[in-house]
């Protein structure tokens, strides 16, 4: 509608972005079903989205760096349904309460840990990685020195599930 705040929508599922109202304030980008190859093996899948300021009033507004995003987030569908959103530099998580049929705040002001014992990467792409990435992965598998601890690889092939584990 002409009163809509959404100017358009882009997704890897579409050949071209959809423009609804070129003068509206925001554009939405999404991967509606991330990890869809995991459906047949009953692994978690999700939806990834971002909301961008409509600065160019057309398709070129989709080609913007992260500083133009006013919000981003994901939904994770699995044993529990989780919705995570970043607004005003704050990451908040909600979990679906199946009895109440509403999302309840489950974590507030989430931060990515500085260190951890787990990493997530698709090792099938090892040959195409830059040398510093290869070295980092190999160092995590075979640490040297007393300060380095071995890290564990966890990768399911769903960006949403893998990123959520990191958070």
Describe the residue ranges of each PLM region:
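IMPase-like, lithium-sensitive Mg2+-dependent phosphomonoesterase catalytic core
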Residues: 1-167
């Amino acid at each position: 509608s002409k009163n809509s705040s959404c100017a358009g929508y882009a997704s890897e599922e579409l050949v071209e972005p959809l423009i609804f109202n070129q003068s509206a304030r925001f554009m939405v980008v999404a991967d509606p079903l991330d990890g869809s190859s995991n459906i047949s093996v009953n692994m978690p899948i999700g939806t990834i989205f971002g909301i961008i300021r409509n600065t160019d009033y057309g398709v070129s507004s989709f080609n913007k760096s992260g500083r133009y995003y006013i919000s981003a987030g994901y939904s994770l569908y699995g044993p529990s349904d989780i919705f995570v959103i970043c607004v005003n530099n704050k990451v908040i998580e909600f979990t679906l309460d199946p009895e109440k049929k509403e999302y309840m705040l489950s974590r507030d002001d989430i931060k990515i840990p500085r260190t951890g014992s787990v990493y997530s990467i698709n090792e099938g792409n090892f040959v195409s990685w830059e040398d510093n990435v290869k070295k980092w992965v190999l160092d995590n598998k075979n640490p040297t020195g007393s300060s380095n601890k071995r890290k564990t690889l966890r990768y399911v092939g769903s960006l949403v599930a893998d990123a959520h584990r990191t958070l």
